[in-house]
Amino acid sequence: MTARPPESCVLAKDRPEEPVVPVVSPGPLVPVADFGPLDRLRGWIVTGLITLLATVTRFLNLGSLTDAGTPIFDEKHYAPQAWQVLNNHGVEDNPGYGLVVHPPVGKQLIAIGEAIFGYNGFGWRFTGALLGVVLVALVVRIVRRISRSTLVGAIAGVLLICDGVSFVTARTALLDGFLTFFVVAAFGALIVDRDQVRERMHIALLAGRSAATVWGPRVGVRWWRFGAGVLLGLACATKWSGVYFVLFFGAMALAFDVAARRQYQVQRPWLGTVRRDVLPSGYALGLIPFAVYLATYAPWFASETAIDRHAVGQAVGRNSVVPLPDAVRSLWHYTAKAFHFHAGLTNSAGNYHPWESKPWTWPMSLRPVLYAIDQQDVAGCGAQSCVKAEMLVGTPAMWWLAVPVLAYAGWRMFVRRDWRYAVVLVGYCAGWLPWFADIDRQMYFFYAATMAPFLVMGISLVLGDILYHPGQGSERRTLGLIVVCCYVALVVTNFAWLYPVLTGLPISQQTWNLEIWLPSWR
C-alpha cells in the first residue's frame, strides 16, 4: 500500500474556455510507514497474562512422573550427563557410553536446574519448563508483530499452551525443547530486524538518500540480526539440526533485504543486496553462529580430562595449508566420532525402535512417542485397573489441520505474495524438509518439536484472516468472531481431554483406550 507525498500544484489550460484544472506533479510513491503494532501497553499486558497461564501449565506437578525417581525415555541420557557437567567442571565423562553424541548447550542448561533443585525430576526439567514458558511469550510477540494484531498474538499464545507437543517437550529434559526455543527466538529477532530495516529505509527515502546510488542506502548496524546469529549458534550447539535453520533463515533474511530495497525504489535491488547486505549477513548469520558454537566448548578446551581432549585427528590439519592447533584438531576428531554415530543410526544397519517414525507422518502427528507407561499396581483412578502414561502427541484439533493450513499458506505465499505466510512456511519447512534427505535414518516424532510453534503461527494467521477480512460488514465480522471462538474452545477442550496422557495422571483402562484415537498411536 502506498501514498503520494504532497507536491506543489501547477495550473494548466488546454483551451481558453476550459476552467483552470489543478494538476499534481508526479512524485515517488512512499510506502506506508507500518513498522509494527502500536498498542504497546496493551500488547505487553496481554503477553503477561498469557505467559502467566503458560507458567501454570508448564510447572504444575512438573516432577511427578519420574518412574520411581528415575528419568523417563531419553531423559536417561541427558539428566545424568547434565549432572556430570555440573560436577565435572563443565564437561561429561560419559562412562556408560564412551561417546558424546550431541553438543553441550542443552545439557549445560539442564545442569542449571539440577544445581538449584538437585538431581530429581523437578531439577532436570526446570530449565526446559522455564524456556517453554518464555517460548509462549515469544510466539505471542512474534505473531502480534507479523499480524499487526494483539488479539491474534494472544490466540497464538493460547494455541501453543494447548499444543500437546510443545507442552510435553517443555516438561521433559530432552534437547529438542531448547533447540525449539533458540530457533523461534532467532526467527523473532529476524522479524524485528525486517521491520527495523524498513523503518531506516523509509527515513532514507524521505531524506532523498535512496536514489544516491543504484544500490540504495546503507542501513547501519543491525543488532537484531546479530542477536539472531548468536541464538542460531546456541541452537547448533544444542543439536546439529540447528544448522538447517541457519541455512533457511539466512536465505529468508536476504529475501527480506531484496524486498525492502525493491519496495523503497532502489534502482538495482538485487545488486544492492549483494553489495550492501550479503557480507554483513554472512558475518551475522554464518560466522557468528560458528563462533558461538565453538565458544560453548570452552569447558572442553579448558579440561585436561575431557573425552578426546588430546586425541588429535588422524588426517585433520596434518597436511593442511593452514596448520590447526592440536586442540582444534582434537575437537574435529571428537565431532567426527559423533557424526559417524549418527550416520550409522539407520534402519538398514539394524537399528529399530518401536516408536520411531518417518517425517511424512509428522505434520498430522500420526505416530507419536510413548515416553512412559505403567500398568502394574497403579492406583488413584477410581477403577480396578489403572494406567499411568505420558505420550508426546500433537493436539489433533491443530495437527490434523496441518495439510490444509500449509496448502493455504502456500497459496498466500505464491499467489498473493503474502510475506507473513512465507516466513511461517520457512520456519516450518526448516524443521521438517531436511529430514527427508535420509529416510533410512532412525527418527522420532519429537524431532517435530521445532515445527509446532510455526504450525501455531500459521493457524493463528488463518484465524486472523477470518477475523479481519477486508471489506466485511458487521454480520460477517460477528460470524468470523464466532467461528474463531468456537475453534479456540475446541482446541482447549481437546487439550483438556488429552491432559492425562500428556502428564501421566492415573486413568482407567477404559479411559486409556478412549484416549488412543488412531491405531498408529498404539
Curated annotation (Swiss-Prot):
Per the record, ranges on the Extracellular side are 64-119, 171, 261-281, 412-418, 464-478
- Single GO BP term: protein O-linked mannosylation
Subcellular localization: Cell membrane
Q: Which residues lie on this side of the membrane: Cytoplasmic?
A: 1-42, 141-149, 193-239, 303-390, 440-442, 500-522
Q: Give the metabolic or biological pathway.
A: Protein modification; protein glycosylation
The way it spans or sits in the membrane comes to: Multi-pass membrane protein
Q: How is it used?
A: The BCG strain overexpressing this gene (rBCG-Rv1002c) has the potential to be an excellent candidate for a preventive vaccine against tuberculosis. Two compounds containing pyrrole analogous rings were identified as significant inhibitors of MtPMT activity, affecting neither the growth of the mycobacterium nor its secretion of mannoproteins. These molecular cores could therefore serve as scaffold for the design of new pharmaceutical agents that could improve treatment of mycobacterial diseases.
Listed under GO cellular component are: plasma membrane
Q: Which GO terms describe its molecular function?
A: dolichyl-phosphate-mannose-protein mannosyltransferase activity
**Where does it mainly reside?**
membrane
Alphabetic keyword roster: Cell membrane, Glycosyltransferase, Membrane, Transferase, Transmembrane, Transmembrane helix
Q: Which InterPro entries match?
A: GlyclTrfase_39-like, Glyco_trans_39/83, PMT_4TMC
Q: Give its E.C. classification number.
A: 2.4.1.-
Which Pfam family is one of this chain's hits? Answer: PMT
Q: What happens when the gene is disrupted?
A: Deletion of the gene leads to the loss of protein O-mannosylation. The mutant has severely impacted growth in vitro and in macrophages, associated with a strong attenuation of its pathogenicity in immunocompromised mice.
Q: Which residues cross the membrane?
A: 43-63, 120-140, 150-170, 172-192, 240-260, 282-302, 391-411, 419-439, 443-463, 479-499
Residue ranges of coiled coil: none
Q: What induces it?
A: Expression is increased in infected macrophages.
**What role does it play?**
Protein O-mannosyltransferase that catalyzes the transfer of a single mannose residue from a polyprenol phospho-mannosyl lipidic donor to the hydroxyl group of selected serine and threonine residues in acceptor proteins. Sec-translocation of the acceptor proteins is required for protein mannosylation, suggesting that O-mannosylation should affect only extracytoplasmic proteins. Is crucial for virulence. It may play a role in adaptive regulation of the mannoproteome during host cell infection.
Q: Family, per the entry?
A: Belongs to the glycosyltransferase 39 family.
The protein here is known as Polyprenol-phosphate-mannose--protein mannosyltransferase
Task: Point out the gene that encodes the protein.
Answer: pmt
